[in-house]
């Protein structure tokens, strides 16, 4: 069982709640209980009408959609300190995705009424939520554009650049992606197949852009990675 102080501390790390005082966070923690969820749990599907905003305290959650041919396309990876389900609270009901726990997670959820009350009292929360929604929609559009216009190696390079921005860690040997992603997971994030991603990852390594060490992606030439994301792989490497 999580101690009250820990609940408040984790709430204070939520990007959407950054304008709340410690006293306000403490009060909120008493009204939105924590839920511990096992890996693989589906929080919602496109068919469900859930009017809750989920705040992720620990773990990671994958937002994805399913193509007509049955392939899964990952739209976003939600990390601790971020929210998901925000699209369900829009008047247009924009959400058309699944949300799945990638590992054991801890979440708390606010109902539409609770959120509306909070936004009335703290308009800064509403402004931040609009910013988050805008950024996420921009990310979705970027993913769709990549799938429609770029070959798989360029898509993979673009994805790695986004992962650098969201979770990259600087080490003495350069930047690395701390989380491990299987080739199947990477494929779902760029609308491809596992075998194709395996070949594309090999091409990026042949170019000297990345290395795989202990199943983690290490960036060895950022400039090369950026060029590949824009121009694709030179014909001599294909």
Mark where each language-model region is.
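Cyclic nucleotide-binding regulatory module and flanking cytosolic helices
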Residues: 1-39, 88-89
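Short aromatic/basic micro-patch
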Residues: 19, 53, 77, 101, ...
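Cyclic-nucleotide recognition modules
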Residues: 76-134, 138
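Polybasic "coupling" helices that flank or enter modular domains
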Residues: 120-191
